[in-house]
Curated annotation (Swiss-Prot):
Boundaries of every Peripheral subunit-binding (PSBD) domain copy: 116-153
Lineage of the organism: Bacteria, Bacillati, Bacillota, Bacilli, Bacillales
Protein name: Lipoamide acyltransferase component of branched-chain alpha-keto acid dehydrogenase complex
GO cellular component, as recorded: cytosol
Species for this entry: Bacillus subtilis (strain 168)
EC number(s) on file: 2.3.1.168
Active-site residues, as the UniProt record annotates them: H395, D399
Reactions catalysed, as given in the entry: N(6)-[(R)-dihydrolipoyl]-L-lysyl-[protein] + 2-methylpropanoyl-CoA = N(6)-[(R)-S(8)-2-methylpropanoyldihydrolipoyl]-L-lysyl-[protein] + CoA
GO MF annotations, alphabetized: dihydrolipoyllysine-residue (2-methylpropanoyl)transferase activity; dihydrolipoyllysine-residue succinyltransferase activity
Family statement drawn from the similarity comment of this UniProt entry: Belongs to the 2-oxoacid dehydrogenase family.
Statement: the UniProt record of this protein carries the keyword Transmembrane: no
Cysteines engaged in disulfide bonds, as pairs: none
Amino acid sequence: MAIEQMTMPQLGESVTEGTISKWLVAPGDKVNKYDPIAEVMTDKVNAEVPSSFTGTITELVGEEGQTLQVGEMICKIETEGANPAEQKQEQPAASEAAENPVAKSAGAADQPNKKRYSPAVLRLAGEHGIDLDQVTGTGAGGRITRKDIQRLIETGGVQEQNPEELKTAAPAPKSASKPEPKEETSYPASAAGDKEIPVTGVRKAIASNMKRSKTEIPHAWTMMEVDVTNMVAYRNSIKDSFKKTEGFNLTFFAFFVKAVAQALKEFPQMNSMWAGDKIIQKKDINISIAVATEDSLFVPVIKNADEKTIKGIAKDITGLAKKVRDGKLTADDMQGGTFTVNNTGSFGSVQSMGIINYPQAAILQVESIVKRPVVMDNGMIAVRDMVNLCLSLDHRVLDGLVCGRFLGRVKQILESIDEKTSVY
């Protein structure tokens, strides 16, 4: 018998922490290796955490709603067949490393994750004048965790700095702490009966990314009206037989995504990203699509959308939306997007100005398809199915001319869809 420790896994390349949203096991439950034991929410994705061992759950260390750093223990599992002697021999080495976080090893300096610090680590280090370059982390990949800093403070390791270092470091915390009171006073206070909702996981990431996008990217907007009467008639005529044959819905959105992917191939400038002293024009056309839940927004990616048929895109939309609803979305599902298409029409919007999905250069809002009287080329008035396409663009990367031509091409593709168009 041996007691094994399960730690918070790294559910994505840049993920530093995770929040336990739900335990799927309880103390005393028997689990097999790879059985899901918890649902964890990060700023990138919701995912089930599988057990690394076969055995019996002895203790749930993390609580539901608690945020833990990658590498921190979440539970203990009693296993069979392990050698207790080996387990005991390993423990002193681990505890010795934990008790001496100040000691800087040559190996730790080479670890790629060492320079990635969480906000909690940066705050504690700033408050106590700790040089993070002199701290060896005990987290995954040598990452410095909040516990490393707290342990250093508790053991008095901070005072090992010489007086000159302390003099230099002393002003930093004061200047760093000056803006904090101003920032705190700008937030509204809760009154009796108000409900406070902690900002964690996906909502925290949305807030951070949207703020970064809005403050860093000079947004500009343009809109174009499209007549999709023939597309609507064609889709409605085949949707039932398509569902019966394929097993999933043929949505209007699939036609829009396909049209955008085709136009991006013809206007590669739209498939670009700002990178400081250069603009990166992406080779792959990976369409990010916004999928909302009751309290969150996810942006999974349809990879190589330009190479897929309308049917293939419809299948991806259905599959990714289901993954979001079931909480099965992976980090890979969210990575690699080069252009975002948002189906704002699904909740009745007719005009909107989207915030660009950083670091992409544009986002297209597909609004509601509505019947409107339209003056035709022959001067007659007819009722047509019309939709507004609203484009937000990064004016560092894109100008009105190329965006207008791009939207015009999307419009042309959509208005040319009829009964001769193949969805396969």
